[in-house]
């Protein structure tokens, strides 16, 4: 079994507030290309954390690819209460994350800040690599996860950056 964690910017972090935003189409094209590359190299599990934005779009693409490839999808939420306060539209997305092949949560609820570090360490230990939509020009809390990932020998990181997206949109 080979599992890849998929994570990245949440929609509000990159100023996308509408699913019909033309940038979503370009991002999904890049996702499709990269996920197919993973599948053709033996990856059989895609793991998500259940966030809106990049993960949501990647989940949609992964579900489409299930028709062509033998793949499994898992969601490991940080907390059991993840998304409970989201609006109705976002609850529909949350239900898609809960309708995958494997669903778990790491903690029942928030108790202390160290839970985040423990969660990321768990994800790193249970996956062989990560596909991350992230650019150092637009930092978020993902920088802590990426630092841990880069410190792990043999952990494979594939970054989708704004430069890669610009190249794709021009071709």
UniProtKB/Swiss-Prot annotation:
Gene3D superfamilies xrefs: 3.40.50.450
Pfam family, one: YpsA
Top-level taxon of the source organism: Bacteria
Similarity remark: Belongs to the UPF0398 family.
Protein name per Swiss-Prot or TrEMBL: UPF0398 protein M6_Spy1399
Source species of the chain: Streptococcus pyogenes serotype M6 (strain ATCC BAA-946 / MGAS10394)
